[in-house]
Structure formats: structure tokens, C-alpha cells
Amino acid sequence: TMDVILDVVRRYDIDGVHIDDYFYPYPIAAPEVAGNAQALDGNGKPATKELDFPDGPAWERYLAGGGKLDRPSWRRDNVNRLIEAMYKGIHKEKSWVRFGISPFGMGRPDRRPPGISGFSQYDKLYADAELWLEKGWLDYFVPQLYWPIAQTAQSYPVLLDYWISQNPQGRHMWPGLF
């Protein structure tokens, strides 16, 4: 990934590199097996089992090498190291080329404003967007705020204010609209 991105930066007169929210794939429901009893979720509905991302061999090598992180933290660390390397590598090649990310619009569940609920990019895509803003590993940030203002659980103005509050480095904040 890095080789391709830096090759594009070197070879072409580009203004920026933009990546979307696909760090690890969005969860895919596992097929149901006939005759198996299905567990219930917290609402009494059948829980959806998700297929796991097939990174087992890399995970095993990490552990064999003395790695101490749990698997979700290890996945986030992989993404974080890629984001940091992309930002630094792009700016090393051409300081004027901008790097930005458009992550899913809701942040970490443990930091969300009251009343905000829904999908967790932190837990499911292993994307720690708050960390990237904190460290300044991007030039602009485009949170995907694809919900109506009146949709309380994913309130556009509440989420926009949240992301602005997570931006101590003062990076450009360009909210994505659907």
C-alpha cells in the first residue's frame, strides 16, 4: 500500500491523497447453519454472527514474536501505523501534497456524546480516528455524517460538534454529506 501511494505522489502532480473508511472490511454476516440454536442479542433478537477477517497467520506471527496487544488492539495498531506512515511519507516526498481521511461518522463508543448510538468504526473497522486527529496524522478530516439532522441517535449537528472537539491540532474539518 505504502509503495503504491508514494509512487503516485512521486510520479504525478497531485494535490492530495484521500482515503475512505475501508481500513478493515465492514462486517459480513456469517451464514446460518441449519439445526444450530442461535444466541440472542441484548434485545432478545437472534444475534448475528459475523465472519472474522482472515488475518490469523499474521496474528499468530505477532504473538510468537512477543506481541502483547489483544487482537482488536493489534488490528487498530496496524491501521494507526499505516496512517502515520502515509502522512509522514507523503510529506517527506512532497510537503505540499495533502493527506486526508473520510472515516465513518461516529467515533469511539466510550467518547460519544450522550444519545448517540450505532455502528462502531473503532470496534468493527479498527479505525481510531480520534487518535489520528490527536496526533495530527492528516491534513484534513471528512467525517461521513450521512444522517438527517432530526435523526437523534446519529444527529448531524451533535456529531459535527463532537468531531470538532476531537481536533486539538486544528486540522481542516470538512464534514461529508450524503
Question: Model segments located where?
Answer:
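Polysaccharide-binding and catalytic clefts of secreted carbohydrate-active enzymes
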Residues: 1-137, 144-147
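C-terminal soluble interaction/assembly domains
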Residues: 115-116, 147-150, 155-178
